[in-house]
Amino acid sequence: MLVRSLELEEFRCFRHLHLVLPDRGLRLVGANGSGKTSLIEALYMLATTKSFRASLERHLVHRSSGSELGIPPYARLAAELFTETERSTLEIVLMVDPASGTVRKLYRRDGRSLRAVEFVGTLRVVLFSPEDLELVTGSPQQRRRYLDTILSTIDRAYLRALARYTRILEHRNSLLKSLAERDQRAADEQLAYWDEQLVTYGAYLLVARLRFLAEWGPRLRDHFQALDTQAQVLTTAYLPSIDLPESLLSELAAREVADAQLIVGARYRETLERLRPDELRRGSTLVGPHRDDVEFLLGEEPLTAFGSRGVQRLAVIAAKLAEIAVIHRVTDDWPVLLLDDALSELDQQHRAHLLATLSALPAQLILTATESDVLETPVLSSLPLFRLNDGRLEPG
């Protein structure tokens, strides 16, 4: 998959940008605040519908947007994509309500309006950034988001199940709060429907995650070993919130999907029944994929506690390289590779290894850095160099 062109209008610092991207990619150099991360962010949004850095979506819209035309603030992102068999255009329009500050997003593919679940996955990207370290050191929510993002872009059924599970969870939590003062029997009757829905979609998500990790994990291990030949073996462990022993977890990924979902569903149902009093007291669903975690292990010890920052960063790079391989295996296509100042914290040896690995892939590569010398290496010499300054793009 290739991004042939990118167009931004009133997005972040860009009033208007039209960029034609070479098939192999390009290098972007600019000071902090010049717009290079915003350009990467735009491509990421066109792939996932979400920003990897904005806490408030209205901050994505240029502060002066719409004022000259006398219309509400807006931003527009568009990209022209090519594969071996087809060509398509993606577009996202963000519209800000001036009174509330809320943002409405419109999605179009080839001019046709789509829902987010239909839009995601047309463009697939893998992002490398300094903040990726939080995949290892951050909260369980960040690791769940990582799994959900990958699986949603390669499996639209997973994305639909995730959206459905999230809505069910909201309804169930609201009901738990309203039933806090009721007796157990009345609560059981009213929760029965939502429990079954939660179990059905929750089991689907959990089994899909286990099957992904079974393929991703060995690739992660091998890439990490190539990056650090002296280190112990890097593995991962899925930590479910429902009662699933470790021995059973390893079996589930190898079973037929339907059988695995039945086993997980039965365990999930039992756990919900056991925790009913606690959930009613707290007014919240205490178990399910929304409470699970993934642990990185160096040897047999948690990487968070026993790995240096340098080793943790290598683990994240290995995770991203494994992600590329799985996406290619599942989709038979290469994702667009986005490196946002991801080389700055690597030593020369590991920087060279990463660039050699990525450059050997037939994938489009877009790299940013604050200093051009980081990107001026022989392996990247075929990629044109551009400089960004306050949203303006100039040949390097």
Swiss-Prot record:
It is found in: Cytoplasm. Transmembrane segments: none annotated. GO terms for cellular component: cytoplasm. The lineage of its organism: Bacteria, Pseudomonadati, Thermomicrobiota, Thermomicrobia, Thermomicrobiales. It comes from Thermomicrobium roseum (strain ATCC 27502 / DSM 5159 / P-2). GO terms for biological process: DNA replication; DNA synthesis involved in DNA repair; double-strand break repair; SOS response. HAMAP family: RecF. It holds the Pfam family SMC_N. The gene is recF. The RecF protein is involved in DNA metabolism; it is required for DNA replication and normal SOS inducibility. RecF binds preferentially to single-stranded, linear DNA. It also seems to bind ATP. GO terms for molecular function: ATP binding; single-stranded DNA binding. ATP binds at G30, A31, N32, G33, S34, G35, K36, T37. Belongs to the RecF family. Gene3D superfamilies: P-loop containing nucleotide triphosphate hydrolases, RecF/RecN/SMC, N-terminal domain. This is DNA replication and repair protein RecF. The keyword Nucleotide-binding applies. Keywords: ATP-binding, Cytoplasm, DNA damage, DNA repair, DNA replication, DNA-binding, Nucleotide-binding, SOS response. InterPro entries: DNA-binding_RecF, DNA-binding_RecF_CS, P-loop_NTPase, RecF/RecN/SMC_N, RecF_2. It comes from the Bacteria.
